[in-house]
């Protein structure tokens, strides 16, 4: 059959090839959104209000939660080692000038690998920090950070409060 013939393998969609393709697109879109919701894709699991970061994607989403969602007092723990190799450009430092990170991040001794941050001011895992607690985070030798002013692997700029740091290794 030719692409412009009226033929359908799906009895629910009599008509042209375009109608059948539209039907498949609708099915896939609905199915993918259902699977995303079932698998909590795009969401980070929480236990007792504490975000459980298990992957590079989780770390990127947590950054968005703080930076764009305004949850500056959010608490998170790393529940496994995190490899950021495929998330390099997607990760933005946690905490912005208008939404300084004021929560807690406990690495629980887990290692962050292949984290490469570059940009302007306040570059680090935590971009802008204020009244926060950072503990037990390990960065391996594959991690790097570059910027203009206020640059650090863990914290770029501390503002509006005390930053408590303990057990951080490189």
Predicted feature locations:
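C-terminal catalytic region of ATP-dependent kinase domains
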Residues: 1-39
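Surface-exposed repetitive/solenoidal architectures
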Residues: 21, 25, 33-170
């Amino acid at each position: 059959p030719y692409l412009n013939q009226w033929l359908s393998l799906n009895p629910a969609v009599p008509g042209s090839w375009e109608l059948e393709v539209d039907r498949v697109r609708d099915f896939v879109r609905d199915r993918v959104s259902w699977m995303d919701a079932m698998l909590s894709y795009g969401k980070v699991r929480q236990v007792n209000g504490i975000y459980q970061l298990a992957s590079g994607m989780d770390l990127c989403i947590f950054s968005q939660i703080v930076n764009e969602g305004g949850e500056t007092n959010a608490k998170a723990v790393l529940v496994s080692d995190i490899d950021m190799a495929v998330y390099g450009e997607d990760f933005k430092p946690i905490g912005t000038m208008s939404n300084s990170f004021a929560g807690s991040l406990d690495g629980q001794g887990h290692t962050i690998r292949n984290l490469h941050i570059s940009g302007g001011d306040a570059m680090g895992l935590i971009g802008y920090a204020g009244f926060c607690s950072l503990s037990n985070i390990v960065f391996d030798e594959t991690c790097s950070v570059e910027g203009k002013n206020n640059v650090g692997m863990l914290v770029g700029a501390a503002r509006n409060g005390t930053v408590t740091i303990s057990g951080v290794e490189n």
